[in-house]
Amino acid sequence: MEIIPAIDIKDGRCVRLYQGDFAQMTVYADDPVAVARRWQAQGATRIHVVDLDGARTGRPQNVDAVLAITQTVQIPVQLGGGLRREEDVAAALALGVERVIIGTAAIVETELVARLLERFGERIIIGIDARNGMVATDGWTVTSTIAATDLAGQMAALGARRFIYTDISRDGALSGPNFTALAELVKPDGPAIIASGGIANLDHIRQLAQIGVEGVIIGKALYTGAIYLPEAIAIAQTATG
């Protein structure tokens, strides 16, 4: 099981939001590149980057910061936020990003997602961001009438092989992941599931390993010091052999 540190970027700075609320934002660093270097130095094998401005506007905004990260670290970077057009996805991959996360487009443009999966294969991750079990879009500002489990089924039918599941009410709240929802999504021989939102301590990591998720994205707990990355990595490796 892989531990993936998160770097959320707004206006070029590394920040964290509480439950996706832009009005409840904490700035942790002015230089996201320095943060990426720190996580790499502490043993990260992958970094999860979110362009928050892009998520809200629908087009990538922090391109320079993303490029600087991919050019600086020697580990893979996955990127989400505002990637709702084929040309933007292609451009992100051209920046050196290994995988991109498609969220809003999975709801509103199924044909686009089908094309992206056909063109880029496993470099496409479907982001399922849920509020009370229903998928949220547009930087989490709109809650749809589509259940997270239904979207997962639809995307798997199109060929998606990897999902990131985020429970919005837990994101940035350090209240624990939604173990029940994650357990519903993890299936033998099914798409890989990466857990995100609410991870606050090492016991959460042990429980996620038991559920069988492929990876765990950790944000706020790393920035507050609640979790020390090398410890989290060691526990993930021990728990999953």
Swiss-Prot record:
GO CC terms in record: cytoplasm
Biological classification of the source: Bacteria, Bacillati, Chloroflexota, Chloroflexia, Chloroflexales
Family to which this protein belongs: Belongs to the HisA/HisF family.
Listed name of the protein: 1-(5-phosphoribosyl)-5-[(5-phosphoribosylamino)methylideneamino] imidazole-4-carboxamide isomerase
Entries under CDD domains matching the protein: HisA
Chief localization: cytoplasm
Listed InterPro entries: Aldolase_TIM, His_biosynth, HisA_bact_arch, Isoase_HisA-like, Isoase_HisA-like_bact, RibuloseP-bd_barrel
EC code: 5.3.1.16
GO biological process: L-histidine biosynthetic process; L-tryptophan biosynthetic process
HAMAP family: HisA
Disulfide-bond pairs as recorded: none
